[in-house]
A protein has these predicted regions:
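Short intrinsically disordered, low-complexity coil segments enriched in acidic
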Residues: 1-7, 11, 17
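Residue-level detector of Asp-centered blade-edge/turn motifs that repeat once per structural unit
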Residues: 3-6, 58-61, 112-115, 166-169
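Conserved beta-propeller blade signature
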Residues: 8-10, 63-66, 117-120, 171-173
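Residues marking helix boundaries in flexible regions
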Residues: 12, 57-59, 67, 87, ...
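Short loop/turn segments immediately following the C-termini of beta-strands
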Residues: 14-15, 69-70, 123-124, 177
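A short loop-to-beta-strand structural motif that recurs across blades of beta-propeller domains
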Residues: 17-21, 27, 72-76, 82, ...
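Gly/Pro-rich loop segments of beta-rich domains
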Residues: 25-54, 82-108, 136-162, 190-196
């Protein structure tokens, strides 16, 4: 759930494959997605299709960033409701660009920093991924092994990372479902346990 500069609240609805928005006056709309279609398509309104949009983030320009989980994609929705694709990969694990990118099942957390970089909790791969505005995907931290080891980059381990937040200095905070911890990742990829 995110709030924009006008006080509107948006959520991703994975069961209906839509994005919902509620105004400060409690008017609820569905600005993108089609509850009758589970699929993949860019566009506006119900011409845009999602397959289990799982989490949502917002930038300072009120653009929404969406994990389109079953499409292994990161999508962007403008304030006017136009949906575009930043990266569309497939199942597995691979960094890179375009269709070469792979995400694990149930990628579940997303956050965006002030430079427009997206951070994804790749839950199935126990990694935190970074997606640049140009769509280049790299692994910020984690090596795929489930654990709670602090370290740098691939020297760190996560156990089912779920939700993310980014502070003004570019540090990423990660919640772990199974260990019930909050981890901190610096922009250089140094992982520490923030809340044990």
């Amino acid at each position: 759930m995110v709030a924009d500069s006008q006080g509107n609240v948006s959520i991703a609805d994975p069961s209906l494959n839509i994005i919902r928005k509620m105004t400060p006056g409690a008017v609820v709309t569905s600005p993108a997605g089609n509850c009758l279609i589970s699929g993949f398509a860019d566009g506006s309104g119900n011409n845009a299709h999602f397959d289990a949009p799982r989490d949502i983030a917002i930038d300072t320009s009120d653009n929404l960033y969406i994990i389109d989980s079953n499409n292994y994609a990161m999508r962007k929705m403008s304030p006017l409701g136009v949906v575009s694709t930043i990266v569309h990969g497939s199942y597995g694990f691979a960094d890179g660009t375009g269709s070469a990118v792979k995400f694990g099942g149930n990628a579940s957390g997303i956050a965006v920093d002030s430079a427009g970089n997206i951070y994804v909790a790749d839950t199935g791969n126990n990694r935190i991924r970074k997606v640049t505005p140009a769509g280049e995907v790299t692994t910020l931290a984690g090596n795929g092994t489930a654990g709670s080891v602090n370290g740098t980059g691939a020297g760190a381990q996560f156990n089912s990372p779920m939700r993310l937040a980014v502070d003004g200095s570019g540090n990423v905070y990660v919640t772990e479902l199974l260990k019930r911890r909050i981890r901190k990742i610096t922009p250089a990829g140094v992982v520490t346990t923030f809340v044990p």
